[in-house]
């Protein structure tokens, strides 16, 4: 389906120069002189190579329709994730590299959504937030509680996040998987 270049969004799959690309980032740039254009960072689905492309906002681009399927993560087998279809109980292999920076947040039996183009996996979406335990946190400095400063903490999956000063090691917190940021203390 053809669409204007200014409607491209991160996560979409497009066809350009006879190859399929997944859009990683997009930015509309309006220079002081001349017309606006869109700068797109994208990755080749076959080779994994990244490139930047620049189009005028009125240019058209071929967008491929994706089919979203629900799966449950079972285990990792080498460079692949083994996912299970909840309806048919069939196993499905997906390259682990599709997770990118979100890989540390993948947990056993986690529900994930896989984007497919003609049966080929092109992206994986984790839940928006996960609950993890803090294994290391700097102690609170007296007088620091009045300010809105954050302190570094290490999660059980090895990821480092910035947390409020009242959070201590051993507590469970909710973390946003998209950008590894603290959301709140876990309830219960």
Swiss-Prot record:
Similarity section: Belongs to the elongation factor P family.
PROSITE patterns: EFP
Known function: Involved in peptide bond synthesis. Stimulates efficient translation and peptide-bond synthesis on native or reconstituted 70S ribosomes in vitro. Probably functions indirectly by altering the affinity of the ribosome for aminoacyl-tRNA, thus increasing their reactivity as acceptors for peptidyl transferase.
InterPro entries membership: Elong-fact-P_C, NA-bd_OB-fold, Rib_uL2_dom2, Transl_elong_fac_P/YeiP, Transl_elong_KOW-like, Transl_elong_P/YeiP_cen, Transl_elong_P/YeiP_CS, Transl_elongation_fac_P
HAMAP family the UniProt entry points to: EF_P (MF_00141)
GO biological process: peptide biosynthetic process
Keywords: Cytoplasm, Elongation factor, Protein biosynthesis
One cellular-component annotation, GO: cytoplasm
One Pfam family per UniProt: EFP
Pathway linked to the protein: Protein biosynthesis; polypeptide chain elongation
The keyword Transport belongs to this UniProt entry's keyword annotation: no
The protein's name in its UniProt record: Elongation factor P
Compartments where located: Cytoplasm
SUPFAM superfamilies (UniProt xref): Nucleic acid-binding proteins, Translation proteins SH3-like domain
NCBIfam families registered for this protein in UniProt: efp, PRK00529.1
One function term, GO molecular function aspect: translation elongation factor activity
Species of provenance: Acidiphilium cryptum (strain JF-5)
Top-level taxon of the source organism: Bacteria
């Amino acid at each position: 389906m053809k669409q204007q270049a200014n409607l491209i969004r991160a996560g979409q799959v497009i066809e350009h120069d006879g190859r399929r690309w997944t859009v990683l980032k997009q930015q509309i740039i309006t220079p002081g002189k001349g017309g606006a254009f869109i700068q797109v960072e994208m990755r080749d689905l076959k080779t994994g190579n990244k490139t930047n492309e620049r189009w005028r906002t009125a240019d058209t681009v071929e967008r491929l329709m994706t089919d979203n399927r629900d799966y449950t993560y079972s285990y990792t087998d080498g460079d692949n994730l083994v996912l299970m279809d909840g309806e048919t109980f069939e196993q499905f292999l997906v390259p682990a590299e599709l997770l990118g920076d979100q890989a540390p947040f993948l947990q056993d039996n986690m529900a994930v959504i896989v984007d497919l183009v003609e049966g080929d996996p092109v992206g994986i979406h984790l839940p928006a937030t996960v609950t993890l335990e803090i294994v290391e946190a700097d102690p609170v400095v007296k007088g620091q509680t009045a300010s809105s400063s954050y302190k570094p903490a290490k999660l059980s999956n090895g990821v480092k996040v910035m947390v409020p000063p009242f959070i201590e090691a051993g507590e469970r917190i909710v973390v946003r998987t998209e950008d590894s940021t603290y959301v709140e203390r876990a309830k219960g």
